[in-house]
Amino acid sequence: MRPLPFGLLVAAATLVLDQATKLGLLFLTDLPIRQPIVLAPFAQLVVVWNRGVSYGLFQQHTELGRWLLVAVSVLAAVALTAWMARTGTRLLAGALGLIVGGAIGNAIDRIAYGAVFDFVHLHAGGWSWYVFNVADAGIVLGVAGLLYDAVRAERRNAREIRSDA
C-alpha cells in the first residue's frame, strides 16, 4: 500500500477507535456514575473533561478558547495530511496518520461536549500519569514515530556520507 492511503487508513482507524471507546464508555456503561472502574492495581477508568490540551495545559473556559482549540486541531490535521501526501514512507505516513486521527478525535469532543473526554488513568504508588484517551495515545505514538523516522533518516544520511568519502 502506498504511503498516503496507508496514512489515511491509520488516521481513520485512530479516529474510529477513539470515538467508539468514548461513546461506549459514556453511553453504554455506567462509568460516569460508578467511577473509578479499577482495571488493574495500576490502571483505572475515570471521567475527566479536559478543556485544555495535553496534560491539561492551556485550559480554556470560554467559548472563544474552545473554538480556537478546535481551529488549531483542524488546521494541524490539514497541514499534517498535506505533509502525509508528500511523504515517501509508510512509517512517516502512519505516524502522521496517528496524529491526524487523534487531533480530529479530540476536536470532535470539543465540538460535541465543549471539552475532551479523557478516561484512562495510570498510576503506581504515589506516582500518577495524566488521564488520557485513545486520541492522546495516537498523538503520542505518532510523535514517537516522527522522532524514530528522523533518527533513522539521520543515520541513513551519515552512512551515505561515509560511503561517499
From Swiss-Prot:
GO cellular component terms, semicolon-separated: plasma membrane
Annotated GO MF terms: aspartic-type endopeptidase activity
GO biological process, one term: proteolysis
EC class: hydrolase
Catalyzed reactions per annotation: Release of signal peptides from bacterial membrane prolipoproteins. Hydrolyzes -Xaa-Yaa-Zaa-|-(S,diacylglyceryl)Cys-, in which Xaa is hydrophobic (preferably Leu), and Yaa (Ala or Ser) and Zaa (Gly or Ala) have small, neutral side chains
Enzyme Commission number(s) of this protein: 3.4.23.36
Subcellular location: Cell inner membrane
Topological relation to the membrane, as annotated: Multi-pass membrane protein
Entries under PANTHER family matching the protein: LIPOPROTEIN SIGNAL PEPTIDASE (PTHR33695:SF1)
Main function: This protein specifically catalyzes the removal of signal peptides from prolipoproteins.
Family statement drawn from the similarity comment of this UniProt entry: Belongs to the peptidase A8 family.
The protein's name in its UniProt record: Lipoprotein signal peptidase
